[in-house]
Amino acid sequence: MIVGMETENTKNANHRTGGAARRVVELSHPIRHGMVTYPGLPAPEISVHLSREASRDHYSPGTEFHIGRISMVANTGTYLDSPFHRFGDGPDLAGLPLDGLVDLDGLVVRTVDAQDRAVDRDALLPHPVTGRAVLIHTGWSRHWGTDRYGAGGHPFLTARGAAWLAEQRPALVGIDSLNIDDTDDLARSAHTTLLAAGIPVVEHMRGLEQLPLDGFRFHAAPPAVEGMGTFPVRAYAVLPGGEHQR
């Protein structure tokens, strides 16, 4: 039994560091055996490499461990795309500077009530995005885990919107939708433009409705895996105490 660990019910509770209250907001989907992230891609397979029972033969009485095994495609759950995902000569996961993935000044662009599923430049123009983690809140994450999520008609960033962002140089762009591109656009204009500019992309986010428009720090660092362009991340935001949605 583990004593003193944070439980599911307290993940978003207030924490105190140096006397100042803060709140941590989960922005990633849990990865579960057999779950579907993107239609057509295989689901993760989670199994046991070494069971607790089998491990007892290797240790002192009363000592046991569990070693798990997971087989999955890189595009599973909430994940980050590096330029290598699109371009063979771009930085892979290990080539991304860590300071461009963590403790970023966060900004939410809310398009939940928009009539058009296309997030165009006009939705972005009012926002100072340079150097920030720009998180596009479409509300599509409410369909996660249902057939609707991957059935088409998801919100996406237009080619014009991506081009404007690339010019403004945000640190990172995220979205709570199936794909940052319209999947009917086989050129994948948003991926192509942003990753060519060296701007990482985080897809399949959740929980953006819990964030204010700004005033929070964003974190989304994948493992430093060489030769891979995409991998799941534990994305989260840190808010000062007393922050609320607006």
Regions found by a protein language model. Name each.
Residues M1-R246:
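Active-/binding-site microenvironments in catalytic and ligand-binding cores
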